[in-house]
């Protein structure tokens, strides 16, 4: 029976990937469709992806598939053909090709079965996830941005919004998509007559969010097809003004794609203009935060003097200190409660 999971250490895999000479392409895709047996589908796809030397992160559930992957450039078309042939529901699926990419985004293949491909917290049995808003293409997005009756809603986490967003887009301050959905409904209650345009990185979150808004009585709902990635690509190809400002945060080793030259965020330590996310180098912390080159040198890649001192300790002492310490996914939340207030929309948590 073939091995359907990785058995090599993370460090060894990363070193092997970095030593590769063949170029790679970073691709993301998703599809909401019914998967009767996610476990069997996962195992079959794992073998297919492994045979093509694909790395990345893939989630499967009864509701569909969500993937961010790195594919050897020479295998991209073979991968596309085999994916399309795998299931009729995947035929012709849009593959979002990364914009600012050296292909070194992943070094291991992780494929997991989950309850949902995006954790949404929705337990309403009457919710129809297929009743989504209308798609918008790049030119239509730009037209909507100039429409005074249109509101752009950013369905990404606060740390994604902080480094880049569409002009005048509203932030739904939250750490997770699950937290954002009810907030978006509450914040928009007084604006049901407006045109609601939702967007996210690659389309998966805003597609479901558009269905959720319609489920809650909003009738004028759109979402950007392919998210920020596809919008920026098409706008550039068509010679259109790119109206997204700053950097598009991505969930891989790159942590961001440069969309425009503007730097709209600031170092969380000194306040200098900066939009480069990093994880604290202290293995007992790993806080996600924005750090400029000067502070990176000053704090040796750590988020504080305390972490800097701890990371300099002998490995055994570091392990002793980490023992029993809760060290989950920590994020520096500078923007919670801070909103675009041009509409006087209150934060419902205040």
From Swiss-Prot:
Give the reaction(s) catalysed. uridine(34) in tRNA + AH2 + O2 = 5-hydroxyuridine(34) in tRNA + A + H2O
Q: Mind listing the UniProt keywords for this protein, alphabetically?
A: Oxidoreductase, tRNA processing
Q: Does the keyword Magnesium apply?
A: no
- Any one GO molecular-function label of the UniProt entry: oxidoreductase activity, acting on paired donors, with incorporation or reduction of molecular oxygen
Q: What is its EC number?
A: 1.14.-.-
- Name all Rhodanese domain ranges: 146-240
Pfam families (alphabetical): Rhodanese, Rhodanese_C, UPF0176_N
- What's a single GO BP term from this record? tRNA modification
The record, for Gene3D superfamilies, names: 3.30.70.100, Rhodanese-like domain
Write out the catalytic residues in the record.
200
Q: What does this protein do?
A: Catalyzes oxygen-dependent 5-hydroxyuridine (ho5U) modification at position 34 in tRNAs, the first step in 5-carboxymethoxyuridine (cmo5U) biosynthesis. May be part of an alternate pathway, which is able to bypass cmo5U biogenesis in a subset of tRNAs under aerobic conditions.
What family does the entry list? Belongs to the TrhO family.
What NCBIfam families has UniProt attached to this entry?
A: PRK00142.1-1
Q: What is this protein called?
A: tRNA uridine(34) hydroxylase
Q: Look up and give the organism this protein is from.
A: Escherichia coli O139:H28 (strain E24377A / ETEC)
